[in-house]
């Protein structure tokens, strides 16, 4: 991010292992995230005291630690179902809400889920309509009002995001 050393951290790596998906939302709910593990990891990273990062495999539901050694100025927590547990925590210095059009999200999701998870196109569409969209409505959209910055996926949005990131790491 233009001179800022960013450590990306994915909320998807904090799903509970062997968790039974919610009957209404499937995996598209904050209840699927081990918030205590996520918070503990963030605390270690903020103290620059971490030597491994948690990883989660969406197909096998296996959790493991991966060695980690990277200099960073900013931790970017990416994901839809981790921020809810961090609201009000001092570790969450800023929240950015990225808006993407539904067709683009569906296109990206079906590509990822078919390639990485072996799901069929019909399965991805069904999951999106029956689980993802209700989860988005109930858990993700409310974050928009709590965000410090709302951006569109556009060149001007990226410039605004970069400027915001610089303000967070400025001495």
Regions picked out by a protein language model, each given a short descriptive name:
Residues 64-116:
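ATP-dependent NMP and nucleoside kinases share a basic, alpha-helical "lid"
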Residues 6-8, 95-97, 148-150:
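Conserved beta-strand scaffold positions in the cores of enzyme catalytic domains, especially
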Residues 70-72, 111-114, 133-171:
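NTP-dependent small-molecule kinase module
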Residues 1-5:
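A conserved segment at the C-terminal end of the G1
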Residues 7-8, 16-64, 69, 74:
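Conserved nucleotide-sensing/catalytic segment adjacent to the nucleotide-binding pocket
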Residues 120-137:
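Acidic, metal/cofactor-coordinating or nucleic-acid-engaging core segments within structured domains
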Residues 32-35, 39, 99, 118, ...:
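Amphipathic alpha-helical transducer elements in NTP-driven molecular machines
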């Amino acid at each position: 991010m233009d001179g800022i050393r960013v450590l990306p951290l994915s909320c998807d790596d904090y799903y509970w292992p062997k968790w039974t998906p919610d009957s209404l939302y499937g995996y598209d709910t904050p209840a699927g995230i081990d918030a205590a593990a996520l918070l503990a990891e963030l605390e270690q990273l903020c103290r620059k005291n971490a030597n491994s990062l948690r990883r989660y495999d969406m197909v096998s539901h296996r959790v493991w630690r991966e060695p980690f050694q990277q200099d960073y100025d900013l931790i970017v927590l990416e994901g839809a179902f981790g921020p809810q547990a961090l609201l009000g925590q001092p570790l969450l210095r800023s929240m950015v809400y990225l808006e993407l059009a539904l067709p683009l999200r569906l296109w990206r999701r079906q590509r990822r889920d078919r390639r990485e998870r072996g799901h069929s196109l019909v399965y991805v569409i069904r999951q999106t309509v029956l689980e993802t969209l209700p989860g988005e409505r109930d858990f993700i959209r409310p974050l928009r009002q709590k965000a410090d910055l709302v951006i569109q996926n556009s060149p001007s949005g990226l410039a605004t995001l970069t400027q915001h990131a610089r303000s967070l790491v400025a001495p």
